[in-house]
A protein has these predicted regions:
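S-adenosyl-L-methionine
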Residues: 1-41, 55, 61-87
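Conserved small-residue
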Residues: 30, 59, 95-98, 134, ...
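Class I S-adenosyl-L-methionine
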Residues: 39, 56-60, 67, 79-94, 102-274
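Short beta-strand element of Class I
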Residues: 45-46
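Conserved SAM/SAH-binding beta-strand->alpha-helix loop
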Residues: 52
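C-terminal target-recognition/interaction regions appended to catalytic cores
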Residues: 237-353
Length: 353
């Protein structure tokens, strides 16, 4: 297969796509990354829920005419979702959710965060129970298919015990469930980003859950940002600072930690990486100073970040620089979710009478 040039459709192009006849209700929608992926695949998002205010503003800026539920998910009843979605129990085609996952992130201390109130984005709350709130709604709505997304750290270490609880809870309402760790770099995204994807199919449909197959090619960060201006919203590294010195001494594709250790003896800057244009970008996180350009002493610009995150160039980001970076860092890459959605449509939903 010939590798096509890297390109993400514009917001106008996505909104003009014909509806494939299938409806999605989304929870923990964030800025709308997964919702955008479903729209890229031709689905209609008939319900979305997001509790974080800045994420709400970003979602509304991009989908001003779409319904967005802003209450805490714990206050939402299955009947609320079905009423807004215009469906009866058992009619919804796909129920999506990305419960907050920082307690299980491989970049954090997974088990230490269980059962505790912690800061998630702009809110302080318990987040380790939210997956079960998703299951509560799933049980009440009874969609044909569900997709639940989380970090890859959910299936690692002693977090596996929590993973098994989630898997059992997802199967309890009567679903065949499959779980895989998918890497966005094999699904059209120029970024190394592993996510745990649960796909469930209602038992009475008699079909097994499916996941997308890897594409036969990958895109590099250099290909993704080609044609973009070098100037833009970015954090500049000031000459004379430690970070600038480490950046100068670091080769593309390497962490600044080696230079830090050599110059100071300290083991720091482990997640600060100078990107290599011939490779995929490192995982975008909520931190603003982790992905550096290979020739310019700065972070990636927000426009470059959109490209690396699989978002349209004209996708609106609200808030300050840190909040804008966080929105992309927390989002499911739309191009990745589009591949998941297309596979489900072709191999499951089209087979259901």
């Amino acid at each position: 297969m010939t590798k096509p040039p890297y390109r993400v459709p514009s917001m106008a192009e996505i909104k003009a796509l014909p509806w494939n006849g299938y409806r999605v209700a989304s929870t923990f929608s964030g800025c709308g990354g997964s919702c955008l992926g479903y729209r890229m695949a031709g689905f209609r998002v008939v319900y979305a829920n997001e509790f974080i205010e800045e994420a709400q503003r970003t979602y509304k800026a991009n989908h001003p005419n779409s319904f967005l539920e802003t209450r805490d998910i714990r206050q939402v009843k299955p009947e609320d979702v079905m009423e807004k979605a215009g469906v009866e129990r058992g009619e919804l085609d796909l129920f999506d959710g990305s419960p907050p996952c920082s307690a299980f992130s491989t970049a954090g201390k997974r088990e230490a965060g269980w059962g505790k109130v912690k800061t998630y984005s702009d809110k302080s709350q318990r987040v380790d129970d939210l997956f079960f709130e998703y299951v509560r709604l799933l049980d009440g709505i009874r969609p044909k298919v569900f997709v639940a997304e989380n970090v890859s750290g959910l299936v690692k270490g002693t977090a596996k015990g929590y993973f098994k609880r989630i898997l059992a809870a997802l199967r309890e309402p009567g679903y065949r469930v499959s779980c895989r760790v998918l890497d966005a770099q094999w699904l059209g995204v120029p970024q190394m980003r592993q996510r745990t994807i649960f796909v469930g199919v209602r038992d009475d449909l008699g079909l097994d859950p499916v996941h997308p197959s890897p594409l036969p090619y990958r895109y590099t960060v250099g290909e993704a940002v080609e044609g973009l201006p070098a100037k833009g919203d970015a954090k500049q590294l000031k000459p004379g600072t430690d970070t600038h010195r480490y950046w100068v001494a670091t080769k593309p594709g390497c962490s600044l930690s080696d230079a830090c250790k050599e110059l100071t003896g300290k083991n720091s800057f482990l997640t600060h990486v100078k990107q290599a244009p011939h490779r995929q970008a490192n995982t975008i996180t909520q931190g603003t100073q982790q992905l550096y350009h290979w020739t310019e002493p700065r972070t990636l610009t927000l426009q470059e970040l959109r490209r690396v995150g699989g978002f349209p160039d004209d996708f609106a980001l609200t808030g300050n620089f840190t909040q804008k970076w966080e929105r992309i860092g927390r989002a499911v890459p739309p191009l990745m979710m589009a591949q998941v959605a297309k596979t489900i449509e072709e191999q499951i939903l089209r087979c259901v009478a």
